[in-house]
């Protein structure tokens, strides 16, 4: 029963969003929100109008490129750092990892001003690198991969050392393949966080040709009025990439959480 109630609570907003996208603007603001079905026909043309008017192909391209590079950079850096913290011994290891944990406790908004100044001085405003910059390194990913590497038996590396493998070979050929589920989990987390990121794209991308879906949706809000069906149609189109990603990787997502002990 609880599962049914929770499913209903989560599904209703999506249904309301899609059905509002099929109404006229007058109907969306004059009819009670409890009457969610369109009364004057199903206006599928709202999707076509939004697609053409707001250059959704450009928004999709910018968003997917940002997600791709953030995922690649976050997984690579977190895997190397996680291996170092989880398997190697070096001076100051515990102190450095405590700094990683402290960074996880600090709100990301605190770093926006220094990050903006760095991107601005490098001349990377309104560029893909400017969008990707905050996601190059992730403390959460380092923690997630560290727990993944720590859960692997030490005998694997010891056997590889006996066979003559150096540290690079042990990392690339033995340890990394065994933490694939944690890497996929981190990739999904990073993709979701990047997709939802609104403040950073709004700050670094003032050009309509370089902005992302989240920032583009925010800019649809008018000062004196809004076309709500158009906004809901745009929101429906915007969530499609994340729905597709989840449908494809839901098994790996669950496995990554279970095997690594990571959590949001």
Regions found by a protein language model. Give the residues of each.
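A structural signal for multi-pass alpha-helical bundles of membrane permease subunits
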Residues: 2-264
